[in-house]
Amino acid sequence: MKSVSKILNSNISQQLFYLLVLVLFLRIDLVFENNTPTGGDMGAHIVAIDTFIKDFMPNLQINGWSNDWFGGYPLYYFYFPLPAIITFIFNLVFPFGIAFKIMDEMSTILVVYSI
């Protein structure tokens, strides 16, 4: 049987390798450009998080009603609000475009550690 230290060392080195690969392939320099991220269904997420920051957080709400699509719908009643909360926290320091991209890339990197 392998000793615990060997298992931990191999696990840590494997995670560091995956993190290095992510850093090499992700364009970190583009994260800190203040523009709107696009691609896939990213626009839908931007609208929802922007509504969360501009309409809900000034009233200290986690969820509420949004008139952005479908003649109105309940926003964040049936959807996970943590990405919007994280973006709001980063938006206190960075512009919205940068805060959104930091949250997006942070979730990609943290997936490595959840495996």
PLM-predicted stretches and their roles:
Residues F25-I115:
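Active-site lumenal/periplasmic loops and adjacent helix-entry segments of GT-C-fold
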Residues M1-D29:
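Start-transfer (signal-anchor) and selected internal transmembrane alpha helices
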